[in-house]
């Protein structure tokens, strides 16, 4: 389960950023994880709750945006939804597909609470 190491990396990154900004806690973390990123959001949520214990993110709400996969045919240029890496173009039948979205994995934003808030 690589989601645990991913959760730990997220906690480390947001904790460091929040501390640099003088935060006393992180209240919200927004992630963007494409459906083709190879990360299971529910497993990540489970791991995050354990990884965040004792950190500034310990009580943070985790919001995950999951953009769909999109592919573009290298032969005809048609763009379409894909659920997996090996897709056939629905327009011309080509297997020469380039994934154009759905592989994203990033920390979109964090909301911090500073002393006195």
Swiss-Prot record:
It comes from the Bacteria. Zn(2+) binds at residues 73, 76, 89, 92. Gene3D superfamilies: 3.30.2320.80. Keywords: Metal-binding, Nickel, Zinc. GO terms for biological process: protein maturation; protein modification process. GO terms for molecular function: nickel cation binding; zinc ion binding. PROSITE patterns: HYPA (PS01249). Ni(2+) binds at residue 2. Belongs to the HypA/HybF family. Involved in the maturation of [NiFe] hydrogenases. Required for nickel insertion into the metal center of the hydrogenase. This is Hydrogenase maturation factor HypA. It comes from Chlorobium luteolum (strain DSM 273 / BCRC 81028 / 2530) (Pelodictyon luteolum). The lineage of its organism: Bacteria, Pseudomonadati, Chlorobiota, Chlorobiia, Chlorobiales.
């Amino acid at each position: 389960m690589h989601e645990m190491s991913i959760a730990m990396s997220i906690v480390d990154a947001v904790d460091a950023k929040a501390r640099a900004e003088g935060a006393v806690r992180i209240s919200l973390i927004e992630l963007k994880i494409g459906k083709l990123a190879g990360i299971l959001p529910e497993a990540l949520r489970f791991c995050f709750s354990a990884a965040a214990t004792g950190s500034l993110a310990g009580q943070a709400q985790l919001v995950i945006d999951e953009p769909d996969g999109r592919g573009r045919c290298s032969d005809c240029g048609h763009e379409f939804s894909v659920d997996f890496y090996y897709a056939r173009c629905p327009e011309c039948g080509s297997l020469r597909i380039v994934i154009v979205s759905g592989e994203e994995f990033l920390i979109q934003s964090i909301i911090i609470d500073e002393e006195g808030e």
